[in-house]
């Protein structure tokens, strides 16, 4: 079935997402279904083919009746737009603010919508007190504590967490420069995932990035190699999120290959963002 998707953006990253099965049996994207609801909404259409359909939600819009009506009618998965990012949840060391995200989680629970946690470790929207840390032991303690406190607060309420977000450099198989990479080295991603699994064994743990749709791209290969290595060594990773930013030509011709190859590693593949720039109705329909 074809339907257009429009994702509203604010600040650096707002996530709307669809879980897709690269190969229906391989991807294993589970979903909320509502058998009493006709397949006339985005969420119901997705459910009919074993998928879910979600959107980014800012807490500030939950008081808008029109917005909420569309949200609750069309979507069965919710991602907080910015409310779970580090600069909001821990603006100063050890002082946590979960109020805005709590509003979104409460809404989702009241309306039978799953929640995606976004995001625990990211180089952007990071408070200056974190980005200025130069001691490895201090940063490791800070990172592990942040993951532990936030995941503990929402334990049992989050379907999947973006544990680490956008850690790879554009056009490269290597990690980007960040306080985590520069101070802790390559092992920070593994440590973040191991810490996360220890806090909430039931939540799916995801790595999320953009420009990893083209199978031949260096960045795609870098992420693939990391996931393959993690799976071979028992590092807990359950899913890979693809921030799918396409032009009028739609996705790369080998996008299906990319999804299939990641799914073959034993991880869910999820479209965590989807936008199609400068495209007409036909291009939207063909892509979606």
Regions found by a protein language model. Give the residues of each.
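Substrate-binding cleft and catalytic face of glycoside hydrolase catalytic domains
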Residues: 42, 73-91, 99-212, 278-281
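Acidic-and-aromatic substrate-binding clefts and catalytic sites of carbohydrate-active enzymes
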Residues: 56-68, 86-99, 168-172, 212-221, ...
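Glycoside hydrolase catalytic-domain groove-lining segments
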Residues: 104-114, 182-208, 220-288
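C-terminal region of N-terminal signal peptides and the immediate post-cleavage residues
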Residues: 27-42
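Bacterial N-terminal signal peptides
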Residues: 16-30
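Short, acidic/polar
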Residues: 58-74, 101, 140-151, 217-230, ...
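N-terminal export and membrane-targeting signals
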Residues: 2-20
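Boundary/entry segment of secreted carbohydrate-active catalytic domains
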Residues: 39-81
């Amino acid at each position: 079935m074809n339907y257009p998707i429009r994702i509203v953006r604010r600040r650096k990253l707002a996530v709307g997402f669809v879980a897709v099965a690269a190969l229906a049996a391989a991807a294993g994207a589970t979903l909320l279904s509502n058998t009493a609801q006709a397949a006339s909404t985005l969420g119901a259409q997705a459910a009919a083919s074993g998928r879910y359909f979600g959107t980014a939600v800012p807490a500030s819009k939950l008081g808008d009746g029109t917005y909420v009506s569309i949200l609750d009618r069309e979507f069965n998965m919710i991602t907080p737009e910015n409310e779970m990012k580090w600069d909001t949840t821990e603006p100063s060391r050890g002082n946590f603010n979960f109020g805005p995200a709590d509003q979104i989680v409460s809404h989702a629970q009241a309306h039978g919508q799953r929640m995606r946690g976004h995001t625990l470790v990211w180089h952007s929207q990071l408070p200056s007190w974190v980005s200025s840390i130069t001691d490895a032991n201090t940063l490791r303690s800070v990172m592990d504590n942040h993951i532990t406190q936030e995941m503990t607060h929402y334990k049992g309420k989050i379907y999947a967490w973006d544990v680490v977000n956008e850690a790879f450099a554009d056009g490269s198989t290597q990690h980007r420069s960040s306080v985590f990479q520069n101070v802790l080295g390559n092992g920070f991603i593994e440590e973040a995932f191991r810490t996360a699994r220890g806090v909430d064994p039931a939540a799916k743990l995801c790595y999320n990035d953009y420009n990893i749709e083209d199978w031949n791209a260096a960045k795609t290969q870098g992420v693939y190699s990391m996931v393959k290595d993690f799976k071979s060594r028992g590092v807990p990773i359950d899913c890979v999120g693809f921030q799918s930013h396409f032009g009028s030509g739609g996705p790369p011709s080998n996008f299906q290959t990319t999804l299939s190859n990641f799914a073959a590693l034993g991880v869910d593949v999820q479209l965590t963002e989807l936008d199609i720039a400068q495209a007409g109705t036909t291009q939207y329909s063909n892509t979606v």
